[in-house]
């Protein structure tokens, strides 16, 4: 049975416990950092990271979810594009790096923060998770799935979920993912390869539609390469940074079910 993101969040407490048991024993965790890029100059909703949700800014809710998932505040970094976000995160004891507000994408912001953290901590990180700053109800299990796909060798990893609300199919604010699935595998182990992401209704014909969830994993070498590439034509046209990776021939793995 497929679960929506909202349904997943109802199981948060048990998932945090289960994920921490796996994560804290993992060798991958020693070489991994989770970064949350955030800036105030959003096109559709300016100042979104500071939007009040039950008395606290959205970015704080996201940060708390991620810290609960990985079990270590030291491995969670907010890559801020504005001093206002820095002030908020410092007030709650979060690690935060001020980055250039003119960087072209969240991934570029993540990379900038990564370099600073490696310098501060004296470590060389191998895996990077990018959690978008507008996911205040993020289920912790989704971070685990993103990490596991990196261990399978994809350049990048991300998540999709089947669209169950028909009104989302034609909504340009709901990014659709076109995925090639390994049909020979069982549903529990099936891994897909992202072919394209679009704000349009795609693909045509009968069959399910999938919406993209704003979390990415990167092999360090893949992120290094990504940030050396200029914003691609399709990235600029769709306003979707992951298209830069696809146009450059990089692979983005996605799990079949979340």
Q: Which positions does each model-derived feature cover?
A:
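N-terminal glycine-rich phosphate-binding loop and ensuing alpha1 helix
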Residues: 27-80
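Donor nucleotide-sugar recognition loop
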Residues: 230-240
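Short aromatic/basic micro-patch
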Residues: 44, 137, 217, 239
């Amino acid at each position: 049975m497929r679960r929506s993101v909202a349904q997943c969040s109802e199981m948060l407490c048990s998932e945090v416990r289960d994920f921490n048991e796996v994560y804290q024993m993992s060798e991958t965790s020693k070489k991994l950092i989770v970064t949350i890029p955030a800036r105030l100059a959003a096109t559709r909703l300016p100042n979104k990271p500071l939007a009040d949700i039950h008395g606290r800014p959205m970015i704080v809710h996201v940060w708390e979810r991620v810290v609960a998932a990985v079990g270590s505040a030291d491995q969670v970094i907010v890559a801020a594009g504005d001093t206002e976000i820095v002030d908020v995160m410092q007030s709650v004891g979060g690690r935060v790096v001020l980055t250039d507000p003119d960087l072209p994408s969240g991934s570029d912001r993540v990379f900038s923060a990564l370099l600073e953290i490696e310098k501060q901590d004296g470590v060389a990180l191998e895996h990077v998770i990018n959690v978008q700053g507008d996911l205040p109800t993020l289920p912790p299990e989704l971070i685990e799935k993103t990490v596991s796909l990196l261990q399978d060798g994809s350049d990048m990893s991300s998540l999709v979920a089947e669209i169950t609300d028909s009104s989302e199919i034609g909504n340009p604010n709901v990014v659709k993912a076109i995925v090639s699935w390994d049909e020979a595998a069982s549903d529990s182990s099936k891994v897909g390869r992202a072919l394209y992401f679009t704000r349009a209704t795609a693909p045509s014909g009968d069959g399910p539609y999938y919406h993209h969830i704003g979390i990415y994993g990167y092999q360090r070498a893949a992120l290094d390469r990504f940030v050396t590439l200029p914003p691609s034509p399709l990235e600029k046209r769709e306003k979707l940074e992951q298209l830069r990776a696809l146009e450059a021939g990089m692979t983005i793995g996605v799990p079949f079910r979340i």
